[in-house]
UniProtKB/Swiss-Prot annotation:
It comes from Oryza sativa subsp. japonica. It is an enzyme of class 6 (ligase). One of its GO terms (molecular function) is phosphopantothenate--cysteine ligase activity. The lineage of its organism: Eukaryota, Viridiplantae, Streptophyta, Embryophyta, Tracheophyta. This is Phosphopantothenate--cysteine ligase 1. Keywords: Coenzyme A biosynthesis, Ligase. Catalyzes the first step in the biosynthesis of coenzyme A from vitamin B5, where cysteine is conjugated to 4'-phosphopantothenate to form 4-phosphopantothenoylcysteine. Its EC number is 6.3.2.5. Homodimer. GO terms for cellular component: cytoplasm; nucleus.
Amino acid sequence: MVAAEENPESFFAAAPPLRDADAVAARLGEFIARNSSAAGAGGGGRRIVCVTSGGTTVPLEQRCVRYIDNFSSGHRGAASTEYFLKAGYAVIFLHRRGSCQPYCRFLPDDSFLKFFDVDAESKVQVAECHAPVVKKAIGDYCKAIEGGYLLKLPFTTIFEYLQLLKMVATSISSAGPLGMFYLAAAVSDFYVPWDSMAKHKIQSGGGPLDMRLSQVPKMLSVLRNQWAPLAFCISFKLETDSDILIQKADMALNKYKMNIVVANLLATYKEEVIIVTDKERSTIRKMNKDEDLEMQIIKILSQNHSKYICGSTNGCVQSPY
């Protein structure tokens, strides 16, 4: 059973407070200030993008044992973060705990212990077969972190995600059109309001479970109109039915005033996406098995962001591509 959609103010008022909110706000403020004062392409501050990645959970109990999850490995967000960094962006990586991370995509999926060997002197070292990949991952990651270009903020629940997104958006708003949102996270459409949620583990002895779900407030329009009105905004539309994909993408473009919608099908999202703007639709396909589709996506988005900055500031900035 589905209840009517809540308004954003009611959602935030009833949500459990974000842990370490003051510390997160301080880190965000420092990150934005440092990169806003840094020289970017064409002068001025560095471009700043918030990449959201992974799926949100919907707890069924306040002391959560059971939850509803959203499908997302976080691979697209992690890969896109790497290419944004290569393009000269500072990246706030808002990610699901345990999802795919930047620079870790090519590490083996096997047990962590398989990365290592113990030599004759009982010293632990990276296994020779994994050494090149691990060395590159560590080097690239450390460069981004130590350079101050990458800030990672984790979430698990829908409550954490939306509170963090609001904090990030209101911080990025100071960057004006140099700010970007790349909203690749799989966000829950329905949830159990905190004040109507069971406090303890739901017991199975009572028979079938009937649960009333509320619609998660649509935050895209709030982000676009209130939190960061000058930022360049990209949302994603994932569907399983090809017949409604473009229709849904067009609706998101018009209803939420997105600059671009990246449309993809569950069956082919790793090989193909459609870039939808108010002027055109462009299909991007993976050229070969060793190429990242995200490389092409970020190239196109960076070029469109440059045009947006030019139109917003009357000071044209060249894309790094």
